[in-house]
Amino acid sequence: MGKDSQNYYGKHGTPQKYDPTFKGPIYNRGCTDVICCVLLFLAIVGYVAVGIIAWTHGDPRKVIYPTDSRGEFCGQKGTKNADKPFLFYFNIVKCANPLVLLEFHCPTPQICVKQCPDRYLTLLSARNTRDFDYYKQFCVPGFQNNKGVTEILRDGECPAVITPSKPLAQRCFPAIHASKGVLMVGNETTYEDGHGARKNITDLVEGAKKANKILEARQLAMQIFEDYTVSWYWIIIGLVIAMVLSLLFIVLLRFLAGIMVWVMIVMVILVLGYGIFHCYMEYSRLRGEAGSDVSLVDLGFQTDLRVYLHLRQTWMAFMIILSILEVVIILLLIFLRKRILIAIALIKEASRAVGHVMCSLLYPLVTFFLLCLCIAYWASTSVFLSTSNTAVYKVVDDTACPLLRKTCNPETFPLRNESLQCPTARCQFAFYGGESTYHRALLGLQIFNAFMFFWLANFVLALGQVTLAGAFASYYWAMRKPDDMPAFPLFSAFGRALRYHTGSLAFGSLILAIVQIIRVMLEYLDQRLKAAQNKFAKFLMVCLKCCFWCLEKFIKFLNRNAYIMIAIYGTNFCTSARNAFFLLMRNIIRVAVLDKVTDFLFLLGKLLIVGSVGILAFFFFTHRIRIVQDTAPPLNYYWVPILTVIIGSYLIAHGFFSVYGMCVDTLFLCFLEDLERNDGSAERPYFMSSTLKKLLNKTNKKVAES
């Protein structure tokens, strides 16, 4: 038996030995992993430099405003096109050219206009009539009516024809509609191409479709943005409700941990049960309605997601998912009912610890603020980098011109000899790009931007974990709680983390950031290789993605426990990670059961809060609450604010529960160390509370004798 124990501990390190001077987090400590601290500082300096360069070269207007053939923005204030917000295509049919999909730009002249055409006219019919005054606004700026029709069309100064159009994403598209199954523009089923020939409306449809493919995503984004502008204050109210519920739940958990856990379990089951009932009622209501039996596969992807809610198959899928989730939760509760009692006791102990360090509940706000700074800097830098390309002009022509698609300068092109080879060619804005060293390095800068975001975000999270671990470890290792605790345990732990362990936090977050950026690159490669038919490559990609996902989860778990050891002992990252890993391996059964059951209970708490707020948001934004039915704003997609509230509620609940989670993990690790260091004798008494000692049938002999 002794040999087996020796071999076991040899594999997983040696147990902690009794140290009479150890009274909790060590105060006399030195700086750890200084090299990583210096590396983080240099990386931040480089990140700031990248941001400055991006802000110098970038121009977000390229994303906001459409651009005409001269590379000028439509509708931008302070420019000559300030009163011309719409982009007009001379010949929308040419947008059906494959060049559109290659360079995302139609090979036809484009100008900024005040309004889209509202009537059908051709240059031939409008010339020398009163209609030409209206027609001229769709010609190039500075147009002089001193040429013949042929010369005007050859030089691309006016469109051959204008058709009734409607603005979409600040672009003018033909107002095509169907009347009794026949496509029409205005009252016409055909249109004149401006050269005396009549063509079918379907040609316009093809051109509009190709141009519209580029804009579908932007249109969806604009509609989502509109929904946010009219519902943002209701979203904030929903998030405030989630915050109040989370805080109320935490406060109640402080005093009624056992009852609250069981109430939480019952409420989650009831919420899921109501979800199943609601899905069944919607499924039954749609029975017999026209179009409700269409399958999701036949329908395909639709930008208007409300279409899916009119399908019976959608509600059937929701009902099956919720039913499976309900059954899984009930089975877990049945088989883990005894372990749940132990987890409740651990939560009660965590409640006492949080009660003595109440300011810890506010620390997630600090983490949230720092993460918002990281996200804002990353997003703005990413936008400026993506818009720091310069305008690229290329030769466009309807004939087989040898200069076709070659780069040109619009100011000098008409004067150069090359233009004589193709008299009808035009030098037109194509896209934003560049061939300088800076432009070639843009992809690398974007990768660096993403990597630094992961590194800094993980560093912020690590700082919060070390701070909370130090505060709660001070509680556990106080023999007389709370008399032996320091005056300000949270601030003391925060100061120690920044002063001594910035390098260790940078080291741990760097390892995690490397794995995360590799996962992002794998996702990028997977998207690029989706069209490939090589099954081995697909299999290899799936394996790599799975392996790195597991690796990320393991590193997060190891880092979390390493940070607890850093907060207690002040050792470097590698030593702390090794000691934490061996300590957990020596108590693997307790780790697998107690810790994970507690995590499961916290997850149920998050689901209860998110489910409650989500159901309330659903009924409000779908105008199903009669008292406030007229208050809810009209929306393009009511799922936009609902999903935002649900995701935001989860993040808020996660922020509050993360304090409890870190407290439980810290107390659990301290408890394992306590069992190894001490034996309950008068010389080596346990530091754990009387509740935990009773739960585990442990006693201090001195207390037992008295």
Swiss-Prot record:
Chain positions found as Phosphothreonine: 14
Glycosylation sites: 187, 200, 417
One GO MF term attached to the UniProt entry: ethanolamine transmembrane transporter activity
Post-translational modification note: Glycosylated, glycosylation differs from tissue to tissue. The molecular mass of the mature glycosylated protein is highest in kidney, followed by lung, colon and spleen, then brain and tongue.
Protein location: Cell membrane; Mitochondrion outer membrane
Superkingdom, taxonomy of origin: Eukaryota
GO terms of biological process kind: choline transport; ethanolamine transport
Membrane disposition: Multi-pass membrane protein
Cytoplasmic side: 1-33, 254-256, 337-364, 478-504, 585-599, 660-706
A GO CC term assigned to this protein in UniProt: plasma membrane
Catalytic reaction equation(s): choline(out) + n H(+)(in) = choline(in) + n H(+)(out); ethanolamine(out) + n H(+)(in) = ethanolamine(in) + n H(+)(out)
Transmembrane segment boundaries: 34-54, 233-253, 257-277, 316-336, 365-385, 455-477, 505-525, 564-584, 600-620, 639-659
Extracellular side: 55-232, 278-315, 386-454, 526-563, 621-638
Tissue-specific expression: Expressed at high levels in lung, colon, inner ear and spleen (at protein level). Progressively lower levels in brain, tongue, liver and kidney (at protein level). In the kidney, prominent expression in glomeruli in the lining of Bowman's capsule and on the mesangial cells adjacent to the vessels within the glomerulus (at protein level). Strongly expressed on the membranes of splenocytes and in lung parenchyme (at protein level).
Keyword annotations of the record: Antiport, Cell membrane, Glycoprotein, Membrane, Mitochondrion, Mitochondrion outer membrane, Phosphoprotein, Transmembrane, Transmembrane helix, Transport
InterPro entries reported for this sequence: Choline_transptr-like
Function: Choline/H+ antiporter, mainly in mitochodria. Also acts as a low-affinity ethanolamine/H+ antiporter, regulating the supply of extracellular ethanolamine (Etn) for the CDP-Etn pathway, redistribute intracellular Etn and balance the CDP-Cho and CDP-Etn arms of the Kennedy pathway.
Subunit (UniProt): Interacts with COCH.
Family membership: Belongs to the CTL (choline transporter-like) family.
Protein name: Choline transporter-like protein 2
Source organism (scientific name): Mus musculus
